Amino acid sequence: MSKIFVNPSAIRAGLADLEMAEETVDLINRNIEDNQAHLQGEPIEVDNLPEDMGRLHLDDGKSPNPGEMAKVGEGKYREDFQMDEGEDPSLLFQSYLDNVGVQIVRQIRSGERFLKIWSQTVEEIISYVAVNFPNPPGKSSEDKSTQTTGRELKKETTPTPSQRESQSSKARMAAQTASGPPALEWSATNEEDDLSVEAEIAHQIAESFSKKYKFPSRSSGILLYNFEQLKMNLDDIVKEAKNVPGVTRLARDGSKLPLRCVLGWVALANSKKFQLLVESNKLSKIMQDDLNRYTSC
């Protein structure tokens, strides 16, 4: 009786073909499930639809008048953007601010800069207040009636130095309120392209570029880290350091900078290795303590 010998490579090739066939079948099944995913959900009951869905209607096939369409569009815009007369404006405004806070947290977690987020948020809040809290009608008439008298007074009297100082202080307070919360010390000077400030920051960082700073590590020990380990260009480090609250003001005054706080800030934003090794909660406290100590001097 003759024996039939099978080449092992042929067996391996056959097994590979079987595995590929199984993977192909699985892929086809997944595609079918994905394409039919909308059919697997629970049916929607008409009674459970949102209130806005009740405004939907079917056209009867007749083309509406363009003027009527414009009126409907304007009314819909006012209805969506303005609050109802029967609702409490303060409660709606509080709900709006809560939503704004949630949106800010999401944007910060996604990596966006706080200054950019805050400037956009301020504009949105101002537009919301301007639409939903308009000036009382009596105020505009008073302004018109006092316009002529105001012009005559300007010709006769000029503001004293004390009045100018009070006006400038009020303007500074208004600018500070619009730019952001004062506790965070996010000032508009962080965005200025001041070459002398950048030169001062670069000078102090370059002097301590190789110096090791102590940071809390996740292993309950000490993590030694310096600016060299960032492997970044000095210009990029300076640009990132200007975002640290209070650093621009200290550099403009020629004061000493909290370099450990600056290093921690830049490393957290640009070094994944540093993020894995450092204890973030303790680091935040250390950075805040350094910042408070240097800015209070």
From Swiss-Prot:
Residues 158-170 have a biased composition (Polar residues). GO terms for molecular function: RNA-directed RNA polymerase activity. The modification Phosphoserine is found at residues 63, 162, 210, 271. One of its GO terms (cellular component) is virion component. Pfam families: PP_M1. This is Phosphoprotein. Gene3D superfamilies: 6.10.140.1560, Phosphoprotein, C-terminal domain. It comes from Rabies virus (strain Pasteur vaccins / PV) (RABV). It comes from the Viruses. Residues 138-172 are annotated as: DYNLL1 and DYNLL2 binding. One of its GO terms (biological process) is symbiont entry into host cell. InterPro entries: PP_M1-like, PP_M1_C, RABV_P-like_C. A motif (Nuclear export signal) lies at residues 49-58. Keywords: Chaperone, Cytoplasmic inwards viral transport, Host cytoplasm, Host nucleus, Host-virus interaction, Inhibition of host innate immune response by virus, Inhibition of host interferon signaling pathway by virus, Inhibition of host STAT1 by virus, Inhibition of host STAT2 by virus, Inhibition of host TBK1 by virus, Inhibition of host TLR pathway by virus, Interferon antiviral system evasion, Microtubular inwards viral transport, Phosphoprotein, Viral immunoevasion, Viral RNA replication, Virion, Virus entry into host cell. Phosphorylated by host PKC and by an unknown kinase. Belongs to the lyssavirus protein P family. Non catalytic polymerase cofactor and regulatory protein that plays a role in viral transcription and replication. Stabilizes the RNA polymerase L to the N-RNA template and binds the soluble protein N, preventing it from encapsidating non-genomic RNA. Also inhibits host IFN-alpha and IFN-beta signaling by binding and retaining phosphorylated STAT1 in the cytoplasm or by inhibiting the DNA binding of STAT1 in the nucleus. Might be involved, through interaction with host dynein, in intracellular microtubule-dependent virus transport of incoming virus from the synapse toward the cell body. Residues 132-187 are annotated as: Disordered. The keyword Lipoprotein does not apply. A motif (Nuclear localization signal) lies at residues 211-214. Residues 140-157 have a biased composition (Basic and acidic residues).
